[in-house]
From Swiss-Prot:
The keyword Cell division does not apply. Residues 69-72 are annotated as: G3. This is GTPase Era. GO terms for biological process: ribosomal small subunit assembly. It is found in: Cytoplasm; Cell inner membrane. It comes from Syntrophus aciditrophicus (strain SB). It is a peripheral membrane protein. GO terms for cellular component: cytosol; plasma membrane. The gene is era. Belongs to the TRAFAC class TrmE-Era-EngA-EngB-Septin-like GTPase superfamily. Era GTPase family. GO terms for molecular function: GTP binding; GTPase activity; ribosomal small subunit binding; small ribosomal subunit rRNA binding. Monomer.
């Protein structure tokens, strides 16, 4: 696939899908945000924050990098968790390149081993991304790289800090070398294929993850019921429902005299106004949907498709 330069010469154009995979909490979503230069995927300190595949598009003069952030691969016990893991593993065959993200400060983690075996079986070009190098001494890095190199013939091993951005320019340069020639799949001004409703729901869910504890974050699903733009008033009106599994969880989400729900809404509104670059009117409701994480019908209703 060629493009014409201003001088009339053909310039090779490359494009491809790049899956970001790994265990929970290794920095996959932080990496996606760092690559895009904007916060698209929600980030918390809790494992299993990401539930859906999130596509982020990075354009260059001669390439389009289409990154796919995935849920962390883990031992799944509920239908929701099994769907999350399946969403991640489908990326093995849907991608042109796979980025296995691991923590640079640790020895080879036992849970990385089955992921590496799946990489081998897929035959997909794969990079090892050693994240969080800002937290370790440099002399710790080479032995860990050698250990992973002995497990699989990765095309490239690249140390990075997704948080500080160190190593991301090198990663993009190396990815370009392996991208296939192809068309521009998405327009220049498109950063993701996700809807505004989905992104608003994710911002709300991030605040629930950050402000609540124990089972509450994992028992909550956010559905945006209304998303209406009022251009005359430079305003978006959003109405959303937080679905939980038990009455006791509903009480915690609402909080004493509604204080927790108000805090969730305030923090979400501030982030939405930054992301959508306009004023936001946000109203939140809380509803009990008993055992929704185990009910295939409700999982589909909340966007977690089987």
């Amino acid at each position: 696939m060629d493009r014409k330069s201003s001088g009339g010469c053909s310039i090779m154009f490359k494009s491809g899908f790049i899956g970001i995979i790994g265990r929970p909490n290794v920095g996959k979503s932080t990496l996606l945000n760092g690559i895009l230069g904007e916060k698209l995927a929600i980030i918390t300190h809790k494992p299993q924050t990401t539930r859906n595949r999130i596509m982020g598009i990075r354009n260059a003069d001669n390439a389009q990098f289409i990154f796919v952030d995935t849920p962390g691969i883990h031992s799944a016990s509920t239908p929701l968790n099994r769907l999350m893991v399946r969403t991640a593993t489908e990326t093995f065959t849907d991608s042109d390149i796979l980025l296995l993200v691991v923590e640079a400060g640790q020895a080879v983690h036992p849970e990385d081993l089955p992921i590496i075996e799946s990489l081998k079986e897929s035959g997909t070009i794969s990079f090892l991304i050693l994240n969080k190098i800002d937290l370790i001494r440099k002399e710790q890095l080479l032995p860990l790289m050698d250990a992973y190199r002995n497990l699989h013939s990765f095309a490239e091993l690249i140390p990075i800090s997704a948080l500080t951005g160190e190593g991301i320019p090198l990663l993009l340069d190396e990815l370009w070398k392996y991208l296939p020639e192809g068309p521009q799949y998405f327009p220049d001004d498109m950063m993701t294929d996700q809807s505004e409703r989905f992104l608003a729901a994710e911002i709300i869910r991030e605040k629930i993850l950050l402000l609540t504890h124990k089972e509450i974050p994992y028992s909550s699903a956010v559905v945006v019921d209304a998303f209406k733009e009022d251009e005359a008033r430079n305003l978006i009106r959003i109405s959303a429902t937080i679905n939980v599994e038990k009455e006791s969880q509903k009480g915690i989400i609402i909080g004493k005299k509604g204080t927790m729900l108000k805090e969730i809404g305030t923090r979400a509104r501030v982030d939405m106004e930054k992301f959508f670059a306009t004023r936001i009117f946000l109203e939140l409701f809380v509803r009990v949907r008993k055992d929704w994480t185990k009910d295939p019908r409700m999982l589909r209703e909340f966007g977690y498709n089987e």
